[in-house]
Amino acid sequence: MRLEEDVKLDYKDVLIRPKRSTLKSRSQVSLERRTKFRNYEPPFSHNVEDYHYNGVPIMASNMDGVGTMEMADKLAEGKIFTCLVKTYTAEQLIQYFDSDMPERTDNVAMSIGTSDEDWCKLEIVHQIVTEKLKYVCMDIANGYSDHFAAHVRK
C-alpha cells in the first residue's frame, strides 16, 4: 500500500460562483451537454464528431432494478444515459442493441466485469452489433487495482 501525504482539497475548499445568465426564462434552459472523449478514436471510418456524447450528463447505474432495458429505453427518450446490469445474456444484449433505435446506441452502455466470461460476452455482442454498441461500462469494486488497469488495456 502507498501512503499519500500531500495536501488534498475538499468540498469546503471550493467556491462555485455562478455566471450571469443570458436566458430570460427557465424554459430556455437545456440540460444537454456535449462531451468529447480526449483519448477516443472511433474504430470505424465514420465522422469523429458522431462519437462524442451528446445528452444530459446524468447516468442511471447498472444496479438491479435500475439498469434495466425498460428503464434505459424510457430514460433515452430524454437523452439520459443508462448502464445496463451485467446479468443480461449475450443473446438478450444482441437483440436489444441490434435494433433500429439510435437512442439505444447513443444513451445505453453494456456492463461487464473483469472475468474472462464477461470479456467473451463483450466480444460476442460487439462482433454482431458492431457500431450499435458504442459504450461499455466496466463495473469493478476497486478501480485503482492493477487487475482493473490490465483489463482496460485489453
Give the residues covered by each predicted segment:
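Active-site entrance/lid segments in N-terminal catalytic domains of soluble metabolic enzymes
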Residues: 1-154
